[in-house]
Amino acid sequence: RQCLIKSTNGTMKEIHGHIKDSADIIKNKDIEKHIHLKCLENGIYNIKTGEFSESFSSEYIILNQIPHRFDESCTFDGCQKIFCSILPEKQQRQKFFDFLSTCLHPYTGIDFQLGVLGPPGTGKTQLGKFAEKILGEDNVSHATIHRIAMDPTLQIGIAYQMLNIDGDLSPEDIEQLDVLKKWISQEKFTNRKIYNYAENFRPTTRLMFMANDLYEITNENDAEAIYERTDILKAEQKFRGTQKEIKNIFEDVATESELDGLVTHILKNSTILYQKQKTTYPLDPRHVKGIWNRFGNWIRQFIDNRTVEGASLQIETRLLFEAWENYAITHSCPAKTKNEFYKLFEDITGHQRTRTREDTLSKWVYKGMRLLDEKEIEAAGQAKLKEVDDC
């Protein structure tokens, strides 16, 4: 050990080369060959066939052990009650279980990230903690999506986990779209490791994030790419600071028996997903877009509902920001500074501020658009109501 600590980079390369020449190296194809086999405390579950066996072969290449038992006699009624309190809708609970099932079985083509959206104190963090308890602490990482996208060394370090939880989604997380798309789809990466060796890998790690609010996606193509690869659960029941609050809510009910029953359920569910090649409730990008527009794309909604474009039109930036402030108050949108608003507005519309002169006054304007007046806003609202009625 002391020799390794004092060794130089060249020495470590020699050691690495010696190990590579004298030992069998596990390759990606070896991992993928046995990826459907899940190692538990009491045996192996084959997701493809739905069969459980207490025997284990040394030929299996399995990177993760689930720290629970496969036991069809166990139930998880206590945990289910808590799930029902955080996610009252059956469809949302099933989506959560389906996502955990995909964490157990990568490379199936059933690829998406899961977000849990809701105000503070609604149990989002508890869902993340419980996902970690189900899959096992050693199989779950907690890096931000932004860091995963930017740090190749971190990518290799967490590539073969079952799940990564980003506990607080940030605007930077949704900017790294190229890496995010590849990671969610579990495509091949090539990154340089320490000692200058490049490594090819396909991540098995699914992504999960928590958010109080979503963020503005300024590019329409980027937005569609995220909608197609994301499902969102909504946690809306407030617990923190109320009589319903229970600290570490899962601790008392998450007994070994309950966890065994839940893991057994999720494993069997993963077999169903594999056989059907889809989740119970397939991802609907239009639904995700609707949620994102409501909880994130506020400025885009303002532009769509309060402005109109035209080559000969222009609007003074000061009046535009005042209109946004009124819109934000009316629709309970998060506040933005002038600079934040102008940057997002320009990214979305492609318009740039220009200085113009009117009589003796100089002012900043956006050319090519104007604000709607009150009658136009009312008429547009009536037209949308008619569209809903027609549907």
What would you call each of these model-derived segments?
Residues L127-F130, Q161, E175-W183, A225-R229, ...:
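Alpha-helical scaffold elements adjacent to nucleotide-binding pockets in ATP/GTP-utilizing enzyme cores
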Residues I15-H18, K29-C39, Q94-F99, F112-G115, ...:
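Short coil/turn segments at secondary-structure boundaries
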Residues E256-W298:
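Phosphate-handling catalytic cores of nucleic-acid transaction enzymes
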